[in-house]
């Protein structure tokens, strides 16, 4: 009987990527297949996030819910991976003794060995070391699930923002060699992938050796140029980037590489220089706006999303007003915005925070409502235009329709005869946008058209 693994993922796209790799590793070594039902699983893994307190506590809540499964089936293995595992280590087992495996983001490739050791010794296994980039040398070929794929190009972050736990849980920045990344992407393209998203905590800090052991270094702009030359790759995305290292070389890449989409996620975190300094972000609002101005001079239709933290210690009403002014000036398409959550061990956790929670909540609601107005306005402006989309899958609500994404990352659902679905999935097509919904668009097929850009 085939054994199964259930993985629940918290947090960022890096974690989504890592979760897929956990399934790949256990599939190759143990023959496990993925299940969406924990009750059916022989191995249950939680890939965790420690960026916010709520996500961290939810892990222990979920662990409590699977405890009864362990009691009913002592052979069931329960593991905790990701950033909470890296931060908490063996204390997870102390708090939840029924946990068998604790592993960090850099040691997920060791899961088969940890499982063997757990079975042989009868004791929980904990491995939260930072063996740099070793894990990529031990991962099996990726499973392809549609025409889009994530590719991790580096690990860790060396920025040490005052509020952020990532450098402590994922380690400092380490880049994969250029040829390793290109080989993986070429393999994906051979299997039908048309769009890749290059992943890292801070991708524009990428500095990869041209080949393993070489002294010549490729920066992020060079990597993008090489990826664009891989046959079959039609679109390039990346996340996440840092304003401090958004070089002129990278800006110029938007003029040189048409396959690089006109959509950018560039976290600003705040609109007040005073708060940015307290956050240790390393740039001013003016410097951030200068990057966007240069990019929009090259790509006037650039769609911009960001991350914002409301209620950072010491935030005044004037600081918040400056944030809202930045939102107005930048015309953000999307924002991942949250109330500040102090993380143990970070410098900001020691700052005095005297802003009432109800004030923080009011500010957050105002920010999110304003961003949502931007989203609706931008979506409505797309109605009547022809957009290039990559067809990804059948539509979730209607099997007679297909769904794809625009360059600015909006989902478009459109009708298509069922007999054409297999042919259209994975194709770049032009659709005319006929209606804008709150979080998606509706389109009509215009042309299957793989090379020339859509006409607006």
From Swiss-Prot:
Q: Which gene encodes it?
A: miaB
Q: Name one GO cellular component term.
A: cytosol
Report domain Radical SAM core positions: 143-377
Its UniProt entry gives the catalysed reaction(s) as: N(6)-dimethylallyladenosine(37) in tRNA + (sulfur carrier)-SH + AH2 + 2 S-adenosyl-L-methionine = 2-methylsulfanyl-N(6)-dimethylallyladenosine(37) in tRNA + (sulfur carrier)-H + 5'-deoxyadenosine + L-methionine + A + S-adenosyl-L-homocysteine + 2 H(+)
What's its EC?
Answer: 2.8.4.3
Q: Where does [4Fe-4S] cluster 2 bind?
A: 157, 161, 164
- Textual note on the cofactor: Binds 2 [4Fe-4S] clusters. One cluster is coordinated with 3 cysteines and an exchangeable S-adenosyl-L-methionine.
The protein in question is named tRNA-2-methylthio-N(6)-dimethylallyladenosine synthase
Q: What is the lineage of its organism?
A: Bacteria, Pseudomonadati, Pseudomonadota, Betaproteobacteria, Burkholderiales
Q: Which organism is it from?
A: Paraburkholderia phymatum (strain DSM 17167 / CIP 108236 / LMG 21445 / STM815)
